[in-house]
From Swiss-Prot:
EC number: 2.6.1.16
Protein name as catalogued: Glutamine--fructose-6-phosphate aminotransferase [isomerizing]
SUPFAM superfamilies: N-terminal nucleophile aminohydrolases (Ntn hydrolases), SIS domain
Lineage: Bacteria, Pseudomonadati, Pseudomonadota, Gammaproteobacteria, Legionellales
Species this protein is from: Legionella pneumophila (strain Lens)
Record-annotated SIS domain positions: 279-427, 454-594
InterPro entries assigned to the protein according to its UniProt record, in alphabetical order: GATase_2_dom (IPR017932), GFAT (IPR005855), GFAT_N (IPR047084), GlmS/AgaS_SIS (IPR035466), GlmS/FrlB_SIS (IPR035490), Ntn_hydrolases_N (IPR029055), SIS_dom (IPR001347), SIS_dom_sf (IPR046348)
Designated gene of the protein: glmS
Functional note: Catalyzes the first step in hexosamine metabolism, converting fructose-6P into glucosamine-6P using glutamine as a nitrogen source.
Amino acid sequence: MCGIMGAVSERDISKVLLEGLRRLEYRGYDSAGIAVIDSQDRLKRVRIQGKVQNLADAMQETAIAGNTGIAHTRWATHGKPSEQNAHPHLSHGEIALVHNGIIENHEHLRQQLITYGYQFTSETDTEVAAHLIHYHYQQHENLLLAVQKSAAEMQGAFALGVIHQKRPEELVAIRKGSPLVLGFGIGENFIASDALALRSFAQSVIYMEEGDSACVTTQDIKVYDSNRILVQRATHPLNSDSEIVNKGPYRHFMLKEIFEQSKVITDTLESRINSIDVLRASFGEKASHIFPMVKNIHIVACGTSYHAGMIAKYWLESLAGLPTQVEIASEYRYRDVVVPDNTLFITVSQSGETADTLAALFKAKQSNYLASLAICNVATSTLVREADCVFLTRAGIEIGVASTKAFTTQLAAFLMLAAALCKDNRAQEVLRQLQELPACCERVLQMNEEVESLASLFVNKVHALFLGRGVQYPVALEGALKLKEISYIHAEAYPAGELKHGPLALVDKDMPVIAVAPNDELLDKLKSNLHEVSARGGQLFVFVDDSQNWKANGARLIKVPSCGAWLAPIIYTIPLQLLAYHVAVAKGTDVDQPRNLAKSVTVE
């Protein structure tokens, strides 16, 4: 969500901080700001509502410069998007603070600080943290201790970066439930909410652990655990500038990432399957011991990853015969869950830092589960560190807020898992089809121009309805989510068999209805449902297997290359991604950074 960047350097750091924010734009934000301590130890701040480029323009006007500084992109939680609510927040013109997360007891702390004489100028919970740290600094004149004491009083999940004009040589950071990275450079050191921001600036990084705090100077980074004891944390080399993502020849990151799916699926499968087996070591060292004991499965995730889990339910129950329950993480956290014996708990997350998914995993670790498995795209994430078993997808960095390649690699991972847990020779057919998957993706991507031609038919629509049956119902859900995320068209998805139980009332000549219709055992049932749409004058678009002879009957048929039955949910997802993309482009929306959304949702 919010992006944090901070540095202490022997040079002017303002342009580095700005570039760090540009690399964090993909996370989603509505305002941005920077604060530095200048050569005369004065605290200078610039904040704007809007894009990082607006901040760059404002910085040029004010000629802001300094060797120590913090910067931030804000995604509004407490307080509307505005310059007044943008970070960094100040206290008494001495302390500047950036914050990612939520301080749950901010109202109580606010009232307490008001009694101490503090005045508030914003609606945010962040300003509470700034004043609280100032209060403790007045008592101890030690910035690190002031931050540690303040964090102990604050409830919630957050990460902070703090500077003080009387301590121009240091930057203090703390992590409590929200990710933060420390970076080592030459004559300069950094903090950031994402290692991507530090590429080409830092040579190596430390991923702060839960409860860690750090004091960062030009010469050193000292890390303290939750007990305020100095500790040594593992350092990890950081990839060079050559690996920083760019759009290449594509107009948007989302389109680039859609077209990368064949490659990243190839990477995800590589060295993990052969013609007769899935290498269980792909799921971690413990998998060979755990998998034979699995009798039930619970899958917990959010958003697109939840849809991946829903598809996986069909595969796991059909192939492995394992009862599988799929839960939305934010709901799972707050109910009493019955855990049958020998249940495998699976979490799915692109970032591995999704707050609700992590909280669900922590809850599961206190329950009677056999073990936990994380399917994740980020090897250094909290989810990966906390799970018993891990399958790392190899989707690479995904910049577009609307997930594409991360989703299809999650599906590839789940299909491999179903094959690994399958106890009969159907697993070999699944593996054969998986080996064909990258080529199938390439064929589907050749539909791009045909799908683009549909966009003009959706531009002026207000609503859309997606339909699927069986395992294609979650595919329809994902298609509807993509369309609403980036085109802002209200879209719903239903099992086609539920049409007559309510959704049919919405169907008329102005309602586009999109159906997913592979050649499977439910095809005839689906055709019957679609006749109901046609009879009501609905504007029908059907993605059909190109081996089938369909009678259009007024519907627009979009032929999808034939593929193996187990691959159909993956293959039929791709044209729906393309449809959402081209409709959004035709409408002129911000495809890569849609309004109100964040890439990594690190708060509840």
